[in-house]
Amino acid sequence: MNIYPPALFLFYYLCSVLRNVMKTKQILLINDMAGYGKVATAAMLPILSYMGHPTYNLPTALVSNTLDYGKFNILDTTDYITGVFPVWKELGFKFDAISTGFIASERQASIVSAYCREQEKNGTTIFVDPIMGDEGKLYNGVTPATINSMREMLAVADLTFPNYTEACYLTDTAYKADGITLDEARELLRKLHAIGTKSALITSICVDGQHSVVGFNHMTGDYFELPYTEIPVHFPGTGDIFSAVLIGHLLDNEPLSKATRQAMDVVYRFIDLNKDNVDKNRGIPIENYLDLI
C-alpha cells in the first residue's frame, strides 16, 4: 500500500480536478423534444451529460412522440425562441458549443443561425445536423424553403453531418440508390464545404459497394472513409446517438476521424443489443447502455 505525504496527495488531487475542469465544456442543444421516445434532445442529452459535459437545451419544437408511430402532434416553438435569446444575452449566458438539429421553419432557421453566428464570434463551436430526410426522400413537411434554411445553417457550421439523402438535397446532387464512388463522395464533401461548413461528414452512404461514413477535416485538409457493417433493423434516434457521441469526443479534443469511428461503434453496439425489441418506434432505451460509451 502506497502512503503519500499530504502535500503530494494534494498535488495529485488538484491535478485530477484541473484535468476534469479542462475537459468539461458546456454545450447547448437546439433541437426538437419528443414527449415519448428516445430521439433528438431526449437521446442526446443523457449521452453528453454522461460524457461529462454540462448540457442545456432549447426546443425548436415539442413533439408528442416519435414520428414512426404515424400519428403525432407538434408545436412549433419559434415565438418562444424569439424571447429566449434576448434574455440569455442580458444574463450573459455563453456556451462552448452549440448543436442544432431539427429546425421547424425558415423563420426559425434565420433566428437560430443569427444566434449561432453571434456566438461563433465568441469562440463557440457550431455543430449542424441538417435533419430533412432519408433513403432518398424528404420527411413529411420538408419543403424547398426548408432546404434553403438548412443551407443557411451550414453557412455558420464548424462541422455538419448530413446523411447521404440530406447531402444530395443540400448540394443539388442526384441521389443514387445503388451508391456512389469514392470520388463522387469526396465531391459531395467539397460541395458541402463550399456552402460554408468548415468540416463535414456524410453518414448512411454506400461507397463502392460498402456502407460507410465519409468525411473531410478542414484542419488537416484530409478526406477519410470509415466502413461499417449494417444491421438490417430501423430505430429512430440512432442518428442522434451518433451525433451526441461524436460531439462528446470532439469536445474532449479527439481527432475528427477517431471521434467518428467511436460514435459509429457505439451506434452499432446499441442497435445490436436492441435489435429484437418489440416496439422499435420509441427508439433505444439509452439510459440502460450508457456504460458502453
Describe the function of each predicted region.
Residues 23-128, 132-140, 287-292:
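Conserved N-terminal subdomain of the carbohydrate kinase-like
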Residues 35, 223-236:
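Short pre-catalytic strand/loop immediately N-terminal to key active-site residues, enriched for Gly-Thr
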Residues 175-184, 251-261:
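Short, charged, surface-exposed loops that flank catalytic or proteolytic processing sites
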Residues 141-223:
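Conserved phosphate/ATP/ADP-binding segment of small-molecule kinases
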Residues 3-17:
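Hydrophobic alpha-helical signal peptides and transmembrane signal-/tail-anchor segments
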Residues 169, 233-256, 260:
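Short, small-residue alpha-helix embedded
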Residues 257-293:
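Charged C-terminal helix
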